[in-house]
Amino acid sequence: MNSDSSSVSSRASSPDMDEMYLRDHHHRHHHHQESRLNSVSSTQGDMMQKMPGESLSRAGAKAAGESSKYKIKKQLSEQDLQQLRLKINGRERKRMHDLNLAMDGLREVMPYAHGPSVRKLSKIATLLLARNYILMLTSSLEEMKRLVGEIYGGHHSAFHCGTVGHSAGHPAHAANSVHPVHPILGGALSSGNASSPLSAASLPAIGTIRPPHSLLKAPSTPPALQLGSGFQHWAGLPCPCTICQMPPPPHLSALSTANMARLSAESKDLLK
């Protein structure tokens, strides 16, 4: 009985022992943490004390300088922004003024009606009109080049000096020919017929000139001033062919200078 009671009493007293042990252990752990924190803080304090006074003053001055610099920079930036806005506005105003002047100059040369009642074209309409006008001029220039190439190029024989007929025929046959004659040589030929027995048979290169090209317009002179059917080409364009550029035959040297002067005087009288 005594042994049982002692065991029960020992069991009942064991929880108190455990609580005391845990409390003591917790107190020791807490004290250890506090001592560690105190040592860290004391170490930091010692380091701060060991830092030289110059570095501390330098850091404070740097912070103060940065704050003051930021304030000055902010004030200057507002002034700079105002100046920048003024510069941008002036540059944009000048650009628009130059653009309007250029558009006005382009409208002056555009082929459309000018006047107070005509509405002014917009910039886009002016540019489109200028584009179409340039394309039209380019196509006209290309067509003119093509026509000139046909006149002086491969189709040169269609309206100029053709094959020379060397067959000797009657002078009346050459006179009744449908081919026109060069005006100067024709006048010389007529004057030669009046003064000397010079006929078209002796000048085979004169009676074989073909009629003018159909693309060439007829001269706008009145009928009284018409100088012949062959003059409508020779008055406009010089003949570049070899037959017209070559010197005259030896038998044409019989024409004197007086006859040529008389021919030129007659042509001037006709043109008056």
Swiss-Prot record:
Residues 24-33 have a biased composition (Basic residues). It comes from the Eukaryota. InterPro entries: bHLH_dom, bHLH_transcription_factors, HLH_DNA-bd_sf, Olig3_bHLH. GO terms for molecular function: DNA-binding transcription factor activity, RNA polymerase II-specific; E-box binding; protein dimerization activity; sequence-specific double-stranded DNA binding. Residues 68-89 form a coiled coil. Signal peptide: none annotated. CDD domains: bHLH_TS_OLIG3 (cd18941). It holds the Pfam family HLH. Residues 1-14 have a biased composition (Low complexity). Residues 36-46 have a biased composition (Polar residues). GO terms for biological process: axon development; negative regulation of transcription by RNA polymerase II; positive regulation of transcription by RNA polymerase II; sensory organ development; spinal cord motor neuron cell fate specification; spinal cord motor neuron migration. Residues 1-71 are annotated as: Disordered. Gene3D superfamilies: Helix-loop-helix DNA-binding domain (4.10.280.10). It is found in: Nucleus. One of its GO terms (cellular component) is nucleus. May determine the distinct specification program of class A neurons in the dorsal part of the spinal cord and suppress specification of class B neurons. This is Oligodendrocyte transcription factor 3.
